Amino acid sequence: ILDQYTQQGGNSMYLIDPVHVQKDSLYALSGTTVSYGNALELDDLFFKFGFRLRQELVKDLYSAPIVLAQGQQNTSQYLPYPWPYNPLAAPNQDHPIGSAVGSVHFQFASPIDTLKNKVKKTVLIQSSSLSKIEGIPSLINLSSATEPIKPSLFTDSKQTLGVLLEGRFNSLYTNRIHPFEWKSKEIQPARMAIFSDGNLLENQIDKGQPLELGYDKWTNNFYSNKQFLKNTIHYLIEDNRFLSLRAKEIKIALLDTAKTESELLYWRYFGLFAPLLILLILGLIFNGYRLKSYRQ
């Protein structure tokens, strides 16, 4: 269904976890979990489309913190700690989707590889240059957040976490025998966005109610997940008016600093005495008019 939908020009957005991390176990009393591959049986289809989701985890020094309780019972304190498994990724500012959008909060994301074919590919979002790839399966321990981070280990450069694909996608079933005759064999152009984190559009819950997308209630921080995904959807449905309006830049004319400093004394005295001079002239005109009226 996905293959034929794309062949007929259907636009789509995928948010997929190539690696499964059981967060319920991680945040339980044990504070540990094991990451392992998430078998979705979509690898061949995505490979044909022109990309591959790698079953690895991206760790980033530039990341969102997590809040952990420190101390015992009544004396415990909730403190933020850096958590490299939560990359704060930077959108592509040169594309309408990422223009003027801040950092986007990912959780246990994976790298994406692009493959050579006729489909146009644009990287939408990446981790920072201080990234590290972690293989699976791996043991993830919550207590590691309190340990010192070694920046020297984060040497894997930027990792792609989101890609936009545009063009005519070849079918996975090309040159295979069809069970029935397809009406149109002409492939229609389509757009596709892929992100390697299914939690990208996950809202946090507070008192049974969903919070705004991108808001972290534990740190009181706002991230740009909502705006980034809205831009992606508007681009996929070809709502260019919304994107062009958001991407519009208003240039503010700035004063010439050197000229301002050189003429500072002049304008200071001008601002001080010019109003007084204007009042004096107006007073003389008014008095002259009154004297002329009395003489008549």
Regions flagged by a language model, labelled:
Residues 1-241:
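Acidic, S/T/G-rich, low-cysteine, solvent-exposed domains in lumenal/extracellular/periplasmic regions
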Residues 55, 174, 238-245, 279-282, ...:
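Intrinsically disordered or highly flexible coil/loop and linker segments, enriched in small
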Residues 230, 234-260:
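Juxtamembrane amphipathic/hinge helix adjacent to a transmembrane helix
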Residues 254-296:
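C-terminal signal-anchor/stop-transfer transmembrane helix together with its immediate cytosolic
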